[in-house]
Amino acid sequence: MRTPLLSTLAIFAAAAWVWIHAAETPRYLVSHNPVLVELFTSEGCSSCPPADALLSKFDRQSRTGAEIVVLSEHVDYWNDLGWKDPYSSHVYSDRQNNYADRLGLSSVYTPQMVVDGTIEFVGSSARSANDAFARAFSAPKIPIHLSSITLVQPDILRAHIETEALTDSFGERDPEVYVAVALDHAESEVSRGENGGQRLAHTAVVRTLLKIGSVQHGQRFAQDVQLKLEPGTDPRHLRLIAFLQQPHQGRVIGVAVHSVGMN
């Protein structure tokens, strides 16, 4: 766990211990109730590479049965400390700050994982992640369907997002609908900062995150969206993610992912 300008031997030792235990066999079994895992990370943080690797492991686990939808959100508050993360955005720093306020944290830190918007922990802790998954897999979710994913222009992606009807069991407030575009895989040669001289690898790197509407109780949500891609983006290596989240970044009550894979 790292906060900029704060680095202690105790924090380093804790990060090292959880990384040693990252190879533990997950305790959760196959589940068809998907969960959303958000990793707040930075290429400028030396404690983050183990968390990046753990997120990649969860992404691979998702393809073998347990439905884990991962997002890597690179914050920008490390950018003045030796290395500017090319995938960072203040959008993700703001999102992390909102979680800190709602979850009662005194400050933000990296690496941090947030599961289904409600459980946060040091992002390199496999044990904490497995405990969070065991709780999250049992929570009910609203099915989300992604379809008609097409590239209408070289830099414009279009998709149809639809949910099943929202029931009273999910509370009285109308959940918000988010859509994200993420790179399947990304790598960087870091020349400066805490990770200087290393080649870092990332999974599901978010490049676009938008709130596109809300779902009213007793109703379905259905909408076509158009998303602008960054210049030079290869759509064959993108994934589209949609999720429902209770207002003010509350509990995630639905999530789906679909490979863009324009072959």
Locate each region found by the language model.
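Hydrophobic helical h-region of N-terminal Sec-dependent signal peptides
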Residues: A10, A14-V18
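Serine/threonine-rich low-complexity intrinsically disordered regions
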Residues: P4-L5, P50, E230, D234
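Histidine-/acidic- and/or cysteine-rich, low-complexity loops and terminal segments associated
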Residues: T8-I11, A23
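Active-site-proximal cofactor/substrate-binding loop regions of enzyme domains
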Residues: W17-Y109
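Bacterial N-terminal signal peptides that target proteins for export
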Residues: M1-L9
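Short, conserved sequence motifs used for protein processing/export or organelle targeting and
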Residues: K84-Q112, D116-N263
